[in-house]
């Protein structure tokens, strides 16, 4: 098997392209994954991948069948993910903060054959297991549960060698679930061939090589960590750092001080929170060579605050679940604060106006279109959305951009009403519909309001059925309803009440007026 970047034709396998290069370089004894007190070498990871892949085959998982992972980042999760791709199955990592109803939806939507779940998240499956017409086989990592079989038993006695299932570059290797315009998760399908560029940004922009350590604060269900930390880091022969538990700034500082990454991937909201925790005093952060930011717009004020606190800049870029890897990024030596950088050499990027013509002059907004080797193959079971987003070989994400005379690109917002909160797409209409099921709520509108630090928070503006009702009680009721039915990142922490919503002459709600009132502190 060739692990050369030119291996674009003929049989291949994504798992081989990710873990094969470091093994071919003789790095079997070097650490591939570290976390907590554990360290797993490339040779040990290869054996884990093969045992898990063999176990999947023994339990009837076949080519093209979906294998879901409701797991925290860990060597076992990575081994299972690569093992699924190695046998020709489709690996799918899930957000561990999904609501049970969303877990049910994903299981049914994917028609998955096998579900790996950590014991601490088993309740998310148990709550909906009885509602499934065709439940998957379940494998549990951690404390014994009343469902499925233990991971140790699942892989026990399996060989640590495994011949990879040959795949064409365009065959599907993995999915990434991303929220759709209705709020329902949608499966973004990626091919085996897309991983062939997994290492290019790390190697060509930031000089990553064996001996480097990469840490992404985001979890691997998120394309930022999956593509650039796990896939890119391993393909470069670097060490990938994983951290148990949901990321919080205090814990992230502890991880950095313990494991000393040389490359650090995170989001603007985490960088802001790290500053609040006094990251400048951390010895581990002084060891980091490059700090990269993606997932949402990086405010210039946050860029400057980070530079003052650490002495090193935040390198901003932008990608998407549909591209897995960044398509715009600032160069470490030539940054433009406030911009997303310039197109990477392996991606084509252009702007189009409302008539579909190319925008060729600077400082004129248009809708961005991207063409890259890592482009997704479509949305599972959503042909209309696929046709809307993939046109003549170009991916249209629905984002508005402009570029300046020096070729730096700037994000101008969404063409539709979707909002990005903590790096994840949120559908206001889904939240609004849920809020209006709460007792006493007649109407509800969700808007994104910029904070002083430039990030966005969700605010729910509601009209009570009874204007004399206690707003405190109504606020509690609506927030309880949201928390019971939606994933936590979709739940606004702020609720405001009005007698009526501002509307146009044709009856359309004017969200911009609500946003202006909230920004001015008049609501």
UniProtKB/Swiss-Prot annotation:
Induction entry: Transcriptionally regulated by HbdR.
SUPFAM superfamilies with a match to the protein in the record: Acetyl-CoA synthetase-like (SSF56801)
Biological process, per Gene Ontology: secondary metabolite biosynthetic process
Molecular function per GO: acid-thiol ligase activity; ATP binding; CoA-ligase activity
Cited InterPro entries: AMP-bd_C, AMP-bd_C_sf, AMP-dep_synth/lig_dom, ANL_N_sf, Benz_CoA_lig
Catalytic activity, EC: 6.2.1.37
Swiss-Prot/TrEMBL keywords: ATP-binding, Ligase, Nucleotide-binding
Reaction catalysed by this enzyme: 3-hydroxybenzoate + ATP + CoA = 3-hydroxybenzoyl-CoA + AMP + diphosphate; 4-hydroxybenzoate + ATP + CoA = 4-hydroxybenzoyl-CoA + AMP + diphosphate
Pfam families: AMP-binding, AMP-binding_C
NCBIfam families with a match to the protein in the record: benz_CoA_lig
Family stated for the protein in its record: Belongs to the ATP-dependent AMP-binding enzyme family. Benzoate-CoA ligase subfamily.
Main function: Ligase involved in the anaerobic degradation of 3-hydroxybenzoate (3OHBz). Catalyzes the activation of 3-hydroxybenzoate to 3-hydroxybenzoyl-CoA. Also shows high activity with protocatechuate and 4-hydroxybenzoate. Exhibits lower activity with benzoate, but cannot use 2-hydroxybenzoate or benzoate analogs containing other substituents at the ortho position, such as 2-aminobenzoate (anthranilate).
Designated name of the protein: 3-hydroxybenzoate--CoA ligase
Origin organism lineage: Bacteria, Pseudomonadati, Pseudomonadota, Betaproteobacteria, Rhodocyclales
